[in-house]
Amino acid sequence: MGVHAEFVLSAVAQGQFPQDGLPEVALVGRSNVGKSSLINALVRNRKLARTSNTPGRTQALNFYRVWPQGKPRPEGEPQPDKDAGRTALSGPVLQAARESGAFYLVDMPGYGFARVSEAQRREWARLIEGYLLTRGALRGVLQIVDLRHPPTRDDVTMREWIRHHRLPSLCVATKADKIGRTAWPRHRQVIARELGLDGDGEPLVLFSAETGLGRDDVWRWIREHVQDWTFDM
């Protein structure tokens, strides 16, 4: 079986987060940087996370449950209905999820979007910071940047914040297919320098949702930080 993934819920308050205790990996990045496309590429489902050319589309924490070895159906359990992915797991289904290495990808609101009010930006910042600092199920953070452009001030601030709070993280530079391969080293060097990735051993993965470049590297990092399991990527 291949990877199975399902949208579970959108949360605008901590009380709405899933309570089944499965590990979580958060995705942070500026608006329209390609977080949704990255999620879809990881699970090989272009329709899972809604993509848009309009920045600021994601205005909540979107939780996607990922079954890396395919979704099992415990013996005696009825076939789930189309809305089963939206409910909290319990009983045999939760046990099967834990045994199979299921986890959540959490798509967070993009930072740096100018077309919202200052009050809305503060509310998003409060929600994101509260999640990243207090969520016990969080295993790591994928910071997404655009390979085509130097990091923004918000990218640098987020990197420093992640480093300050010692959160396990991986920086992923998306849209590698949008520039020529010969330009990759130069663009990679700029991003690494601006984000301070050169001297402390923090990796930077080049990624393309179109070609699959970097997909295995991101999965490898997720495996190392969620738990040990093997699966058909």
From Swiss-Prot:
Classification via CDD domains: YihA_EngB
Signal sequence annotation: none
Annotated function: Necessary for normal cell division and for the maintenance of normal septation.
GO biological process, one term: division septum assembly
PROSITE patterns per UniProt: G_ENGB
Region (Disordered): 68-87
Gene Ontology, cellular component aspect: cytosol
Name of this chain's protein: Probable GTP-binding protein EngB
Amino acids binding Mg(2+): 36, 58
Skewed-composition ranges (Basic and acidic residues): 72-85
Domain EngB-type G: 21-228
Sequence positions that bind GTP: 29-36, 56-60, 107-110, 174-177, 207-209
Family per record: Belongs to the TRAFAC class TrmE-Era-EngA-EngB-Septin-like GTPase superfamily. EngB GTPase family.
Cofactor(s) required for function per UniProt: Mg(2+)
